[in-house]
């Protein structure tokens, strides 16, 4: 893998990871269109770790508040501590549901639905639901203090759908969270914080390669460092950009983008179908 390829893949991963446009679909498409290949599954995981580091630093104050409230609730049961305690529990529940689904079905789903036509359909469905949730569904008014265990179960199940290439993890969790009656801000916050344990959990699968040095030997230290830094910066900017558009009720922009990409994938599906994706 060249330095340019490492930077491009890092840029694509970072920009698309937290936008409701499916990072996995874009990585597959970029590799197929330009003849690029990942240096193994562990390289993809390394890029995800750079993205999750951006989330951790961006939401560091929220994480500290949740952790403090969780443990403080055992000795001081204030309404705020209670809210943070249960918010942490909801994150664990949603993560557990996704983890079980990933272990049982990820290999089958990723292999079955990796064809370009499925990616196009998934992107189109994402765009459709983004329009529905933005224009035709009354936005909820429940914050994290009014969340229930059922919200975490629903969001966790929604996140399982993101195992399908073309369905965005951030998009599905945001959509189902808002359908469940959460405020847009609460749904987005829960979605971003939920990405931390999910991505860290999936990283365990590649820990042997990361520790053994196989990835370093096959890719190169400079290329790995460059892709990691680029992914981190792009992820941070992606978070800021997404939150800004969410506050301005501009999810329809992402819907239009999903439709455009879906059409392009459909048009060029024969060329993509012959690529090793």
Swiss-Prot record:
GO terms for molecular function: undecaprenyl-diphosphatase activity. The keyword Thylakoid does not apply. Its main location: membrane. The chain crosses the membrane at residues 1-21, 39-58, 85-105, 113-133, 147-167, 191-211, 226-246, 251-271. Its EC number is 3.6.1.27. Belongs to the UppP family. This is Undecaprenyl-diphosphatase 1. It comes from Shouchella clausii (strain KSM-K16). The gene is uppP1.
């Amino acid at each position: 893998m060249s330095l340019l390829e490492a930077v491009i893949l890092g840029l694509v991963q970072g920009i698309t990871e937290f936008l409701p446009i499916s990072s996995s679909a874009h990585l597959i498409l970029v590799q197929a269109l330009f003849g690029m290949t990942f240096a193994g599954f562990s390289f993809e995981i390394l890029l995800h770790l750079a993205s999750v580091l951006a989330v951790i630093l961006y939401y560091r104050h929220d994480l500290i508040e949740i952790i403090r409230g969780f443990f403080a609730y055992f000795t001081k049961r204030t309404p705020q501590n209670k809210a943070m305690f249960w918010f942490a529990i909801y994150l664990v529940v949603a993560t557990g549901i996704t983890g079980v689904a990933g272990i049982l079905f990820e290999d089958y789903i990723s292999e079955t639905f990796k064809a370009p036509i499925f990616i196009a359909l998934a992107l189109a469905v994402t765009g459709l639901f983004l329009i529905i949730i933005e224009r035709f569904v009354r936005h909820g008014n429940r914050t994290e203090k009014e969340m229930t265990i059922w919200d975490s179960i629903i969001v966790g199940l929604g996140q399982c759908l993101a195992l399908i290439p073309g369905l965005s993890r951030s998009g599905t969790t945001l959509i189902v969270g808002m359908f469940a009656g959460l405020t847009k801000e609460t749904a987005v916050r829960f979605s971003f914080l939920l990405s931390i344990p999910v991505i860290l959990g999936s990283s365990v699968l590649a820990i042997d390669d990361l520790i053994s040095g196989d990835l370093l030997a096959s890719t190169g230290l400079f290329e790995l460092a460059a892709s990691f830094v680029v992914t981190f910066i792009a992820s941070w900017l992606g978070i800021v950009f997404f939150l800004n558009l969410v506050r301005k009720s501009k999810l329809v922009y992402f819907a239009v983008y999903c439709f455009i990409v879906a059409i392009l994938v459909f048009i060029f599906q024969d060329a993509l179908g012959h690529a090793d994706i």
